[in-house]
Amino acid sequence: MNAHTGTVRGKERYRSGVMEYKRMGYWEPDYTPKDTDVIALFRVTPQEGVDPIEASAAVAGESSTATWTVVWTDRLTAAEKYRAKCHRVDPVPGTPGSYFAYIAYDLDLFEPGSIANLSASIIGNVFGFKPLKALRLEDMRFPVAYVKTFQGPATGIVVERERLDKFGRPLLGATVKPKLGLSGRNYGRVVYEALKGGLDFTKDDENINSQPFMHWRDRFLYCIEAVNRAQAASGEVKGTYLNITAGTMEDMYERAEFAKELGSCIVMIDLVIGYTAIQSMAKWARRNDMILHLHRAGHSTYTRQKSHGVSFRVIAKWMRLAGVDHIHAGTVVGKLEGDPNTTRGYYDVCREDFNPTKLEHGLFFDQSWASLNKMMPVASGGIHAGQMHQLLDLLGEDVVLQFGGGTIGHPMGIAAGAIANRVALEAMILARNEGRDYVHEGPEILAKAAQTCTPLKSALEVWKDVTFNYQSTDTPDFVPTALETV
């Protein structure tokens, strides 16, 4: 027995019966993670009376090689190598009864290039473990050797901007509203008006697929006609995210191929199709020179609560590995969940070549992306022209700002809504480039631009009092310096 950790060694471990996880080698406080280890950070909330170290060791065991009792077949494997090792447990600041558990996994435990296999190990079974009241996967670190087994984003931010010939500003988009019920012809009219008015993209919503009121093929035809007409009228490259999400991969490939035949530069999928389907469509997009947009439909069912589930920063990392080009990552100021610092962390994951540890953004590890392309984050949900200075300041320029209701809900019409957003953006970019303090002068800059733009003036008046000031449920908890081990 190891006197320091209480770990049972050698033949003693293989007595029949049940043994504590921390005595089976899943708790190794002296272990130093290797550069080639995958590291996961869990927020562990044990049941009353359960030792936090035992609970954390159980997470390590149940997400790697352990089961509920000693098994003799462990002696047929390199058990010391393949056991996940919980090497650090810290109390979560300000949250009594919860602990951050750092767990290292040998790289050989994972199939190269497979998010499905990775997630099956890390979150596949352990979240239902009875000794745990709650469990959340907060962050992960992937070694370069593992990152290089994935293709990464099919197109990337740089190539996307080159294809669109649009630089130095955020891209503008809008989700077609109402999301359900429009005929194909009327849907196409919305797309045309929005693009002609100055937007770069329009977008299908997550649940518009192929329903009785509008077959997918009709939608594709009318939308691409609208894109072509808007391009001819504006002289700019335009696009619309055609949602190819369907019930089978065969149907999705059929829709993607038809979108390509029509000349679309981008297709869209939903997160709910699953990790394998996402990777399959990312490979198709790369082979066919298409931009791949991912709507994070369904994510809040497991990302929103702080105590249980999977943090969206982990989903963002998985999706960058998987190969999507766009991902919805929050707005901070809109109607959807988004703590400012936490959201900045998501954007860091999307857009940086190397993520340094940044605890205030919820990033617990250094992460190299090994030359994988960058993802374009998308801000969507409850934003409008009057927030343009805040959006530019908080989110930067490599982002798609999607004003759905803020375009289609404009009192003067869809084209006027698009004009208002484009003029507001151009005014703010000009002010930034001139070196002005556009963050504090934002309302003044917008008011001046509105003097010569009636649609913007109307937008500022209609939505001047619209705010979504609610307390975020997912704020970063972090340990500024290493605390004493529990």
From Swiss-Prot:
Enzyme class: lyase
Reaction(s) the record says it catalyses: 2 (2R)-3-phosphoglycerate + 2 H(+) = D-ribulose 1,5-bisphosphate + CO2 + H2O; D-ribulose 1,5-bisphosphate + O2 = 2-phosphoglycolate + (2R)-3-phosphoglycerate + 2 H(+)
The keyword Lyase is annotated on this UniProt entry: yes
Site-annotated residues for Transition state stabilizer: 335
UniProt binding sites for substrate: 125, 175, 179, 296, 328, 380
GO molecular function, one term: ribulose-bisphosphate carboxylase activity
Active site per database record: 177 (proton acceptor), 295 (proton acceptor)
Annotated positions of the N6-carboxylysine modification: 203
Pfam families assigned to the protein according to its UniProt record, in alphabetical order: RuBisCO_large, RuBisCO_large_N
GO biological process: reductive pentose-phosphate cycle
InterPro entries in alphabetical order: RuBisCO, RuBisCo_large_chain_AS, RuBisCO_lsu_C, RuBisCO_lsu_C_sf, RuBisCO_lsu_fd_N, RuBisCO_lsu_N_sf, RuBisCO_lsuI
Enzyme Commission designation: 4.1.1.39
Database matches in NCBIfam families: PRK04208.1 (NF003252)
Protein function: RuBisCO catalyzes two reactions: the carboxylation of D-ribulose 1,5-bisphosphate, the primary event in carbon dioxide fixation, as well as the oxidative fragmentation of the pentose substrate. Both reactions occur simultaneously and in competition at the same active site.
SUBUNIT field: Heterohexadecamer of 8 large chains and 8 small chains.
Protein name as catalogued: Ribulose bisphosphate carboxylase large chain
Organism name: Bradyrhizobium diazoefficiens (strain JCM 10833 / BCRC 13528 / IAM 13628 / NBRC 14792 / USDA 110)
Designated gene of the protein: cbbL
